[in-house]
């Protein structure tokens, strides 16, 4: 019995183009996903900072200290508005409101 071996000529041009296109699509999808994750993380961190600022102002009110109007942290400007039973903190992406009573 004679075995016949076919010589593999390698990758065709179409296969190469398909492989490159598939890799490019996967790379772009991954980059979009990481960008959206980064944006979500930044938003969550800014929200957390704003909550900390609001809680700090509530403690200042409790101690009888004046409410700060403007705070700069990590390149962000937080504008604070203290009222009788609530504190509003505004920052570039949103605002939060906490009740002190």
UniProtKB/Swiss-Prot annotation:
Keyword Signal attached: yes
Annotated keywords: Signal
Record-linked InterPro entries: Uncharacterised_HI0941
Signal peptide limits: 1-24
Protein name: Uncharacterized protein HI_0941
């Amino acid at each position: 019995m004679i075995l016949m071996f076919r010589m593999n000529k390698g990758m065709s041009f179409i296969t190469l183009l398909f492989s490159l296109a598939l890799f490019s699509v996967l790379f772009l999808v991954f980059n979009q996903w990481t960008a959206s994750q980064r944006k979500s993380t930044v938003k969550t961190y800014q929200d957390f900072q704003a909550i900390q600022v609001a809680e700090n102002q509530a403690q200042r009110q409790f101690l009888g200290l004046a409410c700060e109007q403007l705070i700069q942290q990590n390149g962000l400007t937080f504008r604070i508005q203290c009222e009788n039973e609530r504190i509003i903190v505004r920052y570039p992406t949103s605002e939060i409101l906490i009740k002190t009573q």
